[in-house]
């Protein structure tokens, strides 16, 4: 009988869970290790005053095909809201609510009708934004940061605050002067220029923890509150993982799906294993403010805010809203009461119904290391290492996407596929090697 490999997956975020699923689907035995008590990593849920809340408001777009496939695989498609067509309500202190919506025309013409009626841009702004979108389609090797690219294409301060910032800053979780133009243009091309429906917004209507729980249920063993602090190595192979407290666990292969700083600490000599540049990654916080009112306050499912530290707000249930504050390095250290008051006052300033409603309770969630900053010159590693049975995964690795759920899922799949390809050359009995070779052929 062929013995399938036992693989240790370190990190129960979506990258690790996806890698584990890919391996388990082909018969590999998967041990999942997570140092916290929760599954899902940055896409998880927990209780606040008896309410299960997500650690942050995560959305995907229709172009996030790997994430949508994962949701389908785990049987959660019925719990997913997907816009029939891209449309966003935009709130401002200076004007009544406006809508930016796509038409039925093919991309990129589908945005033109929406721009023509968008009151936060002047006619000249609309023309220049349109020209910048055309330039984004053809500029395949941009230099410098995204803010500089926008300046070179004559984008006004008004266009920045009314269009570019509300969409790009949350997607990249960083100010545009700290983001590479290449990554900014990737977001523009993928969401707005490739397909008319690509920018449709989608999100789960159930707590995010359901996604992670459904994935973990398909693995052989899940070890929560079990930190992996290193790996055992014999020659050119990983033979096990080192656990906190001095214990160890044997494995035939290992997927490490943790942030770059933890990976650097976990590997004795990351550069010697072919994993370089980990010290160059900088993290950016995200803050979410959860507010419970005595009545519904938003009047729509979600909206973008202009000229506000609250970039987006979602009404997740009648009277319960989640305010998302991206690139929140100047807010993450504030006390919870200040963050709750900030969210309340910002909503009251643009929503008369929120100003009249009574706030029942509030809470803030903070992730000081939410995502890496995709700065110019940052080199993201792929899944391979110098050891054929050790791969890495994470939204920060080289998926081509910013640090999003989509990037995490894609990285997990890539790491698993890399192991499949490598496995055919591992020392094993002839029957095992033949079986692995067949698995590799099916995976590819």
Residue ranges of model-derived segments:
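Mid-domain catalytic core of redox enzymes
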Residues: 2, 86, 92, 227-354, ...
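N-terminal Rossmann-like FAD-binding beta1-loop-alpha1 element of flavoenzymes
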Residues: 5-32
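Glycine-rich FAD pyrophosphate-binding loop
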Residues: 24-48
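Conserved FAD-binding subdomain of flavin-dependent enzymes
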Residues: 42-45, 50-82
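Short beta-strand to alpha-helix junction loop
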Residues: 58-65, 140-144, 153, 194-216, ...
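Mobile amphipathic helical/loop "lid" adjacent to a hydrophobic cofactor/ligand pocket
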Residues: 67-68, 72-184
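Helical element adjacent to the flavin cofactor pocket in flavoenzyme catalytic cores
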Residues: 187-244
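FAD-binding beta-loop-beta segment adjacent to the flavin cofactor pocket
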Residues: 311, 366-392, 396-399
